[in-house]
């Protein structure tokens, strides 16, 4: 049963400027996300922006906003096929368990100028 849908779009340039500040990167991204995005070279800003949009989409699907948790408790990394996978820790992991969340489906996309994410949260009936 679908229990939440979230979607977000961000400007890559805006995120590119923000990730120039280490404080922003440490507050928003996990070390693994940061390493992944920086490994993308010229497309690093697009990768950061897509993950930022993904985190926002997760928050919207939960319907909670950032209350009680931190963005670093939502980690988005790709599996060996390149599909984005969401891992939750801390507050958001506990919230997902409480809501009976079984699957989190996430789609990320980006162009030179924009990054977007859509997320569907599925729980047991």
Each PLM stretch: what is its role?
Residues 1-125:
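Core catalytic alpha/beta fold that binds nucleotide/phospho-ligands
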């Amino acid at each position: 049963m679908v229990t939440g849908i979230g979607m977000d779009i961000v400007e890559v340039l805006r995120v590119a400027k923000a990730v120039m500040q280490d404080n922003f990167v440490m507050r928003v991204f996990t070390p693994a996300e940061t390493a992944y995005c920086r490994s993308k070279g010229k497309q690093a800003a697009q990768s950061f922006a897509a993950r930022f949009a993904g985190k926002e989409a997760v928050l919207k699907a939960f319907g909670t906003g950032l209350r009680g948790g931190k963005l670093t408790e939502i980690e988005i990394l790709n599996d060996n096929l390149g599909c984005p996978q969401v891992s939750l820790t801390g507050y958001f992991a506990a919230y997902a368990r409480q809501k009976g969340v079984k699957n989190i489906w996430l789609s990320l996309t980006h162009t030179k100028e924009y990054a977007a994410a859509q997320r569907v949260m599925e729980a047991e009936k």
